[in-house]
């Protein structure tokens, strides 16, 4: 693993902006002209601690222009709320959409930050009535909140989980309706899609998304690409990642360069066909 002195940032993500978007995406900035593939997703697509995340690997392999619109901890809301991002996506030949987790979006039980979707803003009256013993002001992140609620009462938590999954289905339909070009849905995870998903743990990402939910979204997509990372790639861990000693624990929770190679292997052929002809 690569370390730099504490307090320094070993990777320059070359943050850039497209149009009037308030989001700073990973650079270098590219022109939204000609034929290109747009990659929408979360921390993995952004490539935190990764010098060449899978969109960059695909670009190098195929010669296609691949524009990285990954945003750390993105839920569906951040994409729906950004008109400039949607316009950029609609200018592409194809959009690769990394399937997002279900907890990072506003719903009937709580509200999240419109751009930093992992930030919990406030719980609804309904949530407070279900969990009257929980002080919602103690929580700032959705994952922390949901982990605590599940621990307090697994039975009551089923109501929360069901709401997240229902909202995810509806919001995914809306997002894909607003993308007017072919969409490839990407399952990029350390585990295969499961029939049950009720844990907010990072290792379970995309959290609360089940195999049935993926199948519900399939008819709206050009195809679904399943990149369930191999045991060998998981065993490689943080090898090749770049982070400070202070960031080591965070880096260890993310998929490493070997996993990104597998994602590029799966996506490169279809990107080459659709973008390069």
Features from the language model and the residues they span:
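Short, hydrophobic/glycine-enriched beta-strand segments
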Residues: 1, 37-41, 98
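A broad, low-specificity signal for short, low-complexity segments enriched in glycine/proline
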Residues: 1-4, 55-60, 142-149
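Helix-enriched interaction subdomains in cytosolic or periplasmic regions
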Residues: 1-13
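Generic signature of intrinsically disordered, low-complexity segments enriched in small/polar residues
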Residues: 6, 16, 21, 28, ...
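Serine-esterase "nucleophile elbow" of acetyl-processing enzymes
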Residues: 10-72, 78-90
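Short secondary-structure boundary/hinge segments and terminal tails
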Residues: 76-77, 194
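Alpha-helical cap/lid subdomain in secreted, periplasmic
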Residues: 87-277
């Amino acid at each position: 693993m690569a370390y730099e002195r504490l307090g320094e940032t070993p990777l320059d993500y070359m943050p850039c902006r497209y149009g009037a978007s308030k989001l700073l995406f990973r650079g270098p900035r590219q022109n939204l002209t000609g034929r290109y593939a747009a990659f929408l997703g979360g921390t993995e697509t952004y490539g935190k601690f990764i010098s060449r995340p899978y969109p960059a690997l695909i670009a190098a392999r195929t010669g296609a222009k691949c524009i990285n619109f990954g945003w750390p901890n993105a839920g569906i809301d951040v994409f729906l709320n950004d008109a400039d991002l949607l316009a950029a996506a609609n200018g592409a030949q194809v959009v690769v959409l990394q399937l997002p987790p279900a907890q990072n979006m506003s719903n009937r039980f709580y509200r999240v930050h419109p751009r930093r979707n992992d930030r919990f803003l406030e719980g609804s009256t309904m949530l407070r009535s279900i969990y009257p013993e929980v002080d919602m002001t103690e929580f700032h992140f959705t994952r922390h909140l949901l982990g605590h609620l599940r621990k307090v009462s697994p039975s009551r938590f089923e109501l929360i989980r069901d709401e997240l999954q229902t909202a995810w289905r509806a919001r995914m339909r809306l997002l894909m309706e607003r993308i007017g070009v072919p969409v490839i849905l990407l399952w990029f995870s350390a585990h295969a899609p499961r029939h049950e998903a009720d844990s907010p743990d990072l290792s379970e990402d995309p959290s609360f998304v089940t195999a049935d939910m993926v199948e519900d979204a399939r008819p709206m997509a050009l195809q679904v690409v399943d990149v369930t990372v191999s045991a060998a790639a998981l065993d490689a861990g943080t090898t090749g990642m770049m982070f400070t000693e202070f960031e080591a624990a965070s880096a260890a929770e993310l998929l490493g360069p070997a996993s990104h190679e597998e994602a590029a292997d799966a996506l490169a052929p279809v990107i080459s066909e659709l973008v390069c002809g």
